[in-house]
Amino acid sequence: ALIEWLPAHNNTPDETRIVHGDYAPHNVMFHPTEPRVQAVLDWEISTLGNPIGDLTYNTMNWYGPATSTGRPNFSGVDLDSLGIPSFDDYIAKYCERTGRDGIENIHFYKAYNLFRLAAILQGIVGRVRDGTANDPNAAQNAARVIPLAQRAWEEAQLAEKG
């Protein structure tokens, strides 16, 4: 399934940049009164990679399963009233700022990141089982793994359709 599908369908452009690896709202410090970022935190898993991976990880609030990413989900939220752009507007702004015409095969990247997060959480579940987990709430990650993997497969199917 998905573990075989991802490498077989990785026809993404080879584009190497510095990537954060965990670029998401919980690792960004915003200015208290202005709409701008003051700092990006938590760089310990930064590496060289495809920046669209960071982008689609950052946007998981828009497309991830409602209760499984461990972060807020925008499903059913009036984003406009909160000043939060839609997924499409966010991607369009990214493309505008980076000089892109669009994102090729965005569903592949979304499937990859959902699968990646499911694998990370499964690793935490293993640490709970082995008694080596640091976080007292780590066991709750077990319930998140399957919905993430299922959502990843849905994105893989969308990637297949083009």
Show which residues each predicted segment covers.
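Regulatory N- and C-terminal appendages and interdomain linkers associated
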Residues: 119-162
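All-alpha amphipathic helical-bundle segments outside canonical DNA-binding/catalytic cores
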Residues: 101-113
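Short amphipathic alpha-helical segments and their helix-coil junctions
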Residues: 37-39, 86-102, 147-148, 152
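Active-site activation/catalytic loop segments of kinase-like enzymes and analogous catalytic loops
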Residues: 53-98, 112-130
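Activation of the activation-loop gatekeeper triad in protein kinase-fold domains
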Residues: 40-46
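Catalytic-loop signature of eukaryotic-like protein kinases
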Residues: 26-29
